[in-house]
């Protein structure tokens, strides 16, 4: 049975997304001790999938490939920077630059599998043409409670002496481009 959830999608920061999603050693070292929101003992529960048709798993490389593809298909450079224009009423309107790679954070349950999120990605591709490039299930993030959890809280659990409230979620990195036209996908088409 399908379960309702939500996803929040923003332009992907291709230079830093991979470090957070893969939990690289450098990323883990750079997290301030006071801001630890990852339980290292739970990191082994995380899962990942890289689209085999993606080529290089490096997002920066993929971004550069998209820039070249846009130039070849449209004859124009990809509009990367935000710009301003005047509207009909004379007001200044900010127009966002192209976001060819976007990342969504999808709320999941503790028992959600990688196969479940892959099925979601396949449905996004079928409906809107946005291609999932990478999927990361994070089951090691959350926050520490100051005391005991509330009576109805069934997700929090004890780690040593402290209580931890998990934030189960998945990161889905999408290629938002139509590779036949060189233009970005419009979800309302």
Predicted regions mapped to residue ranges:
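N-terminal nicking endonuclease/strand-transfer module with a His-rich metal-binding environment
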Residues: 1-189
